[in-house]
C-alpha cells in the first residue's frame, strides 16, 4: 500500500499498534491512541488505509479505507472527561485537557466485503469476527513533515508551557482548574484563512488572518469550554506549521488566538516567541473549522 501511495507522489506514514508506547498510570491503551491518530487525519479530510489483523494472530488480515466519522456520543464524552490529561509538572494548577477525538467511535469505511460507505464502530470495522485495527497508512504530501503524533506532542507542550500555556494566555477567560476540550486537525492555510475571514466578525481580525504568513499546510488545535463544543464555538486556537521538522517543537508555532488577543510569529523568526501581537475589541467565540469534511444525513 505505501509503495502505491509513493508512486502517486505522496509521502505515506505508516503506524503500527506495536510501536506505540504503553501509557503508565492511565486507562488509555494503545488502541485508544491509534484511534486518536486516525481521527486527527479523518478530521483533516485525509483518507486513511486501515490494516486489520486477527486478535488471536492466527488468521489472515484484511484492509479497508476510512473516509469519515460519525457523530459525537454523550456516553463517550463522559468517559473522555474521566480520561482527561493533566501535565504532571503543572498538576496543581493545570487546566485538564479533554481530547475531542475520544467523543467518537463510529467511522465511515469503504470495504470490498461490505456495501460502500458503511458506518462502523472502530472496534468492529470489519464483518469478520475477532479483527482489530493494527496499522494505518496515511497519504501525506511530501512537505507535511509534522505528523499527527508529533503535532500532538507539540500542542500539549505549548498548552502547559510557562510562557505560552493556558495558565498565561487564557487566565482571564477560564476558571481555575477548568477543563478544556481540544480539537486537532490539519488544513490547507488557504482554505483555513478564507474560512476565518468569512466567519469571524470585525475588520481587524479578518485582516490579520488574511495577512499572517503561513505555509501551505498547518495543524490547528481549537480550544473549547465543555459547554461550547457541541456548537463548535471555540474560545481560542493554536496554529502550528505542518511543514516544520518535528525537532523544532515550539519553533513550529505560527499563531495563537485567545479572547481579545492574537499573537503570531514571522517566518524568519528563530526563537519560540511572538514578534507581533494585536489586541482585539471583542472576545467573540471562534466558529469551528468545517471545510475538511461534509456532513451527510443518512435517511
Give the residues covered by each predicted segment.
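Catalytic-core signature of thiol
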Residues: 1-26, 142-145, 149-208, 212, ...
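A broad detector of the eukaryotic-type serine/threonine protein kinase catalytic domain
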Residues: 181, 193, 220-221, 241
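Conserved catalytic-core surface of thiol
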Residues: 86-191
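Conserved active-site-adjacent core of cysteine acyl-enzyme catalytic domains
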Residues: 1-121, 217, 223-298
